[in-house]
Regions:
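Conserved polymerase palm-domain catalytic core
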Residues: 1-145, 329
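Histidine-centered nuclease catalytic patch
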Residues: 335-368, 374
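Glycine- and acidic
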Residues: 11-12, 54-62, 100-106, 180-181, ...
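Acidic catalytic cores of enzymes that act on phosphate-bearing nucleotides/polynucleotides
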Residues: 228-230, 236-310
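Short, charged surface segments at domain edges that flank catalytic/cofactor-binding sites
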Residues: 291-333, 357, 361
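Residues immediately flanking
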Residues: 12-14, 108-109, 151, 201, ...
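A conserved non-catalytic segment of reverse transcriptases
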Residues: 42, 51, 127-193, 197-202
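Non-catalytic, peripheral interaction segments enriched in hydrophobic/basic residues
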Residues: 187, 191-248
Length: 377
């Protein structure tokens, strides 16, 4: 990254975006059936058995709200590119990244973002009945970092790093704490079942950024919460008794929060709390601009991405191994051996665009240079 071209970030915050979008603008500009759209926009919402009208905006929680808001903000990037055509010509790296109503704009100077870009954004939003929040919209130097979509993005000694933001970590731990607090007398196995989806979802979301140290700290915080949960249930028991009852030893790992429960057939099963730190960190590979998964011309590209994703997951590797065994360890095309030293690939027999699935029976492995077979032999 060239610091001369990319130093400052405009962190934009739209004041009450979902509540203030102009209905007139949406009805005039969103390309859909106007009668249906108007009914959606004017339907109102019910709170405590009382109907509230919607004169502006789209109620949060409504099915159409995220789509309508996204379509309302569509075109901002094109507007900025049209207004500042010389920025790219001079290599000044004005870029915009937007997700729903959250967006950032990069620029070469604080003054340029403040006095030229910000007014252009405000003008675009005003046409749609929206305004930037004066308190929450700010311009930040990349060395100081900024939060976006749950991550903190900052330069450390010239290197740009993305980490889970402090606010996002706090929100996650607060959610874990609330679940534990609401289940003081629950069975341990039931508590684990409530926690695991939350732990897994949060860990997967951050698995593409620099998160290893954060994962370790979060695991320690959760362990502390669970120790207090267990100790409060048995105020007359000692620490050793509590550890034996609630925390197991698995292989080389001690203090694993796990419970053993009986099944209806009399067998036992162990339910174990997931550890965030067990989630591998894997860098995200950006999809090529313009790639369309529904366009047959892009099928080889998405096949390659999908195959790499299979290799990166334990479940995917197991499935590929079964396909390899089914083919007797040979290429589906040339019937020559596929080994660790040969370059190989995986593809669908019936393409997903033609209704094919990801089931093992619809997969084939072949040498990288072999043409894939269109169907089973």
């Amino acid at each position: 990254m060239n610091e001369r071209k990319w130093l400052w970030v405009l962190e934009a915050d739209i004041q009450g975006c979902f509540d203030k979008i102009s209905h007139d603008w949406m009805l005039a500009n969103i390309p859909t059936d106007k009668v249906i759209l108007k009914k959606w926009l004017k339907a109102g919402y019910v709170y405590q058995n009382e109907l509230f009208p919607t004169a502006a905006g789209t109620p949060q929680g409504g099915i159409i709200s995220p789509v309508a808001a996204n379509m309302t903000l569509d075109g901002l990037e094109a507007r900025l590119a049209e207004k500042f055509p010389r920025a790219r010509q001079r290599g000044l790296k004005m870029n915009m990244v937007r997700y729903a109503d959250d967006f950032i704009i990069t620029g070469h100077s604080k003054e340029w973002l403040e006095h030229e870009v910000r007014p252009a954004v405000a003008e675009f939003l005003a046409e749609r009945g929206l305004v930037l929040s004066p308190e929450k919209t700010r311009i930040t130097h990349i060395k100081d970092g900024f939060d976006f979509l749950g991550w903190n993005i900052r330069k450390y000694n010239g290197k740009l790093l993305m980490k889970p933001s402090k606010a996002n970590v706090k929100a996650h731990l607060d959610k874990i704490r609330e679940i534990i607090k609401a289940n003081k007398m629950a069975k341990q196995a039931n508590l684990i079942r409530l926690l695991n989806p939350v732990v897994r979802g949060w860990a997967n979301y951050h698995s593409h950024v620099v998160a290893k140290k954060t994962f370790d700290r979060v695991d320690h915080e959760v362990w502390s919460m669970l120790w207090r949960w267990a100790a409060r249930r048995h105020p007359n028991k000692g620490a050793r008794w509590i550890k034996t009852k609630y925390f197991k030893t698995k292989g080389l790992r001690d203090w694993v929060f796990a419970a053993t429960e009986k099944e209806e057939d009399g067998t036992t099963r162990e339910v174990t709390l997931l550890k965030v730190a067990d989630t591998p960190i894997k860098r995200h590979v950006k999809i090529k601009a313009g790639a369309n998964p529904h366009d047959p011309q892009w099928a080889p590209y998405f096949e390659s991405r999908w195959g790499q994703k299979m290799l990166n997951s334990a479940r995917g590797r197991g499935k590929l191994y079964r396909v390899w065994l089914r083919q007797d360890g040979t290429c589906s095309n040339c019937q020559q051996p596929i080994t660790m030293t040969t370059r190989w690939d995986v593809s669908h027999i019936v393409k997903p665009t033609d209704g094919g699935t990801d089931a093992a029976g619809n997969l084939q492995v072949h040498h990288l240079n072999c043409r894939r077979t269109p169907q089973h032999a």
